[in-house]
């Protein structure tokens, strides 16, 4: 008798054999029918946007099984250029009503196939309406491939008249929206009608599964064929309140290549000259963006304009030259964001919610995108949640100021992106808040070591032998510097007393004059005493400068005598004991003698 464990293993193996293989369409899935399909092909820009409103019916046909999913197919000619595929239930207005889509395979059939999971299984005889949105890049080909500056741009698009599907279609219509009314040619299947820039095909009846019939249109399209060939988006997160974003962008005009020379004169004079070229475009930045900069290889580009709106910041980017077909340019845009709008935490758990790619220009196409998210030093247990598939490279380390073991860098790649990819990714990580003190402590430690080193250095004697003469010269120089300072201070006392005398002559207030005299005597005595002390120190050091200081002291005594004499003369003038003419003559003589003495003192100071 077999053990219960063996029986359980056998049962699990049987169930695994009966289950459908992941990534392949189940052969047991009930057949469905496209009861009605309304296709809209928007070719008004450089993208091909195809929207199909499909009414799916579960015909039953003796089958009682319910359909929990259905299969979408893409033509082999367009599958490699698919940028976005989205499926929604028609009529539902919820923001997140996209159905789950997974790529699958069907044996014996070319093209790409996707399994779409229905929110509610479809019973036999019931129906459901879905909206399928697809966006294709680089499927509008310029024809001719080269044009002159004055010519208009024409493009060719090739697709399928029919809704390519693994299910039969009962009725189908197709509406094609073009960029202009100027149409060179288009296929005439089913006698389509044309109105201005719109072509209407159908209705087509009873279309078998996997039906293909080439649809081709050749028309004028002067919309900007602007492509981001390569873009690197760097997001640097700081727990000190800031998130820095920088985008390195390589742009190329992928329309018809310019043939012949470029005339800026004609370009400025004629409005329709270079009609398919690109003068400028607008980039929408987050509303909280600040410290915005825009530069290229040369430097800052001053032709850009910034407009702050309620819900965004609009930046007009104008390259240094207009972009014609085949022309390229490179630029860098950067800005700062407050972290409280994008960074959330609960204890040591952090979550960064930011856009994987942001708006660069309307109808944008990005061939290759690299996103680098620089987290704070010490971030661990990093997990990334993305709304769509992205490729991850091994994490890197980034070193900047005060880093010790490096900041972790998440590196992610994706190709062929459009506006529908402007969605948020969430980065989860853990971070010990104690590490926020690391950088301030490093700064404190660095200054402490610097000051301690300087203190030790100035106290060390690195000379091999001592030089008494050099030390004596240094002492004399130090004393001389102090003497110069004191002499200048003493001369300043005289100037201040002169101002006091002038005020006395105007106000006739004798108390002002007496107070000035007393202040002069007190401060002059103190300064002169200090100079005498320094003079004795010079004599002790054996310097001949001692005699010059002594001579300067004698000259200063004469200057002081003249200053006090001038005050006495002013006193007599105010008292009416001296005529004004006599006073002015005496004052002139006194000033001349005083100036001569001060000049001699200055010469001695220069000699010191």
From Swiss-Prot:
Keyword Transmembrane helix: yes
Keywords: Acetylation, Endoplasmic reticulum, Glycoprotein, Isopeptide bond, Membrane, Signal, Transmembrane, Transmembrane helix, Ubl conjugation
Transmembrane segments: 441-458
Post-translational modification: Ubiquitinated by the ECS(ASB11) complex. Ubiquitinated by RNF128, leading to degradation in a proteasome/lysosome-dependent manner. Ufmylated by UFL1 in response to endoplasmic reticulum stress, promoting reticulophagy of endoplasmic reticulum sheets.
Stretches assigned to the Lumenal side: 26-440
Localization annotation: Endoplasmic reticulum membrane
Keyword Membrane in annotation: yes
Glycan attachment positions: 300
Biological pathway: Protein modification; protein glycosylation
Any Pfam family the entry gives: Ribophorin_I
Official protein name in the record: Dolichyl-diphosphooligosaccharide--protein glycosyltransferase subunit 1
Annotated source species: Mus musculus
